[in-house]
Curated annotation (Swiss-Prot):
Gene: REFA1
Positions where N6,N6-dimethyllysine occurs in the chain: K55
Residue span of region G3: 91-94
Region feature G5, mapped onto this chain: 194-196
Protein known as: Elongation factor 1-alpha
Lineage: Eukaryota, Viridiplantae, Streptophyta, Embryophyta, Tracheophyta
Region (G1): 14-21
Function per UniProt: This protein promotes the GTP-dependent binding of aminoacyl-tRNA to the A-site of ribosomes during protein biosynthesis.
Family: Belongs to the TRAFAC class translation factor GTPase superfamily. Classic translation factor GTPase family. EF-Tu/EF-1A subfamily.
Amino acid sequence: MGKEKTHINIVVIGHVDSGKSTTTGHLIYKLGGIDKRVIERFEKEAAEMNKRSFKYAWVLDKLKAERERGITIDIALWKFETTKYYCTVIDAPGHRDFIKNMITGTSQADCAVLIIDSTTGGFEAGISKDGQTREHALLAFTLGVKQMICCCNKMDATTPKYSKARYDEIVKEVSSYLKKVGYNPDKIPFVPISGFEGDNMIERSTNLDWYKGPTLLEALDQINEPKRPSDKPLRLPLQDVYKIGGIGTVPVGRVETGVLKPGMVVTFGPSGLTTEVKSVEMHHEALQEALPGDNVGFNVKNVAVKDLKRGYVASNSKDDPAKEAASFTSQVIIMNHPGQIGNGYAPVLDCHTSHIAVKFAELVTKIDRRSGKELEKEPKFLKNGDAGMVKMIPTKPMVVETFSEYPPLGRFAVRDMRQTVAVGVIKNVEKKDPTGAKVTKAAAKKK
């Protein structure tokens, strides 16, 4: 069997008609876990509906529709394999909650695949002031997705077809734009492809013989292997807490950093409750250690279900335990707020698994979101497209961390009026020590 391949997560971004679904569908179709029978069914339906426009996008549309109807689709459908990696497409925009998902995301993307429409007019629409290409790229960079592959798509529909001049023009323009966002364009492969015809997706295309770089598949294989943060102190945000007869209280969540082991003494922030972990399970099997990315349930001694809540964070009592945040300062980008945001604004913050109202206590500075340079001290307000440093105070106890130390606990979405109005990363946190926190007997013995 040999060593298992490393898993990586990919997020596909780009303007609405750039061909994201066709390209992603094509990869999944050719390299993925979709059953041939399912594909044949899709093809037949597509033909009946005269959607010659294609089985690939159709595959993805079907998957999306089923996902939105709440039918859990076998997640294998969103996976495909390269020579080196197992790739999972964690979300494709166009999905209503894309921005929120990308931030509170069940997983951090290791690489963004930016799809550009190379056709006349199509490219210009995508990169224009209000095109989504800019917003998505900025979002990916702000949230720490440092690797990118850029696909110049629809090369079969440029004038003339497969035009090198058009490709060069796009590379130049997109490079200068990505540089402003913060990426280094010299490190980004620009692959000319046709997601529809299949040129340069998996095999080299003779239509593009002027291009000497990698195919999309080769570019995916060249992604730098992600480092998983198992050497950091433990952080495990709780998703749920169950009471299981004969076993007791079982909190459930995903290890974001560090390691969780049976016998460990854990402290739950923000309350400071401290207890011993009896056992750790994943998919109903006992684990000797849980690592970042593992979704686990663990049994804790002498703790009532009511003492723990979704949004609490389990940590190692002896290694930088999680604490309540009295306040924190974040770099925030306002994305779609219709008005002006000033001191006293009180939206809801979605950060890891917690969902808590916070107050914008103080707008500290307004900054240039590309260079990070300060534009104005103590601005009166921030509006759409602005970035700023903001001091926030939670209205209820919550745990957050700086983005640099614990990335998944240091990025958030600001929600208001049922949409994401801003995104942010946390620069520093003022923590407060718990008062009168309960320490169970088992934990006290181990001290």
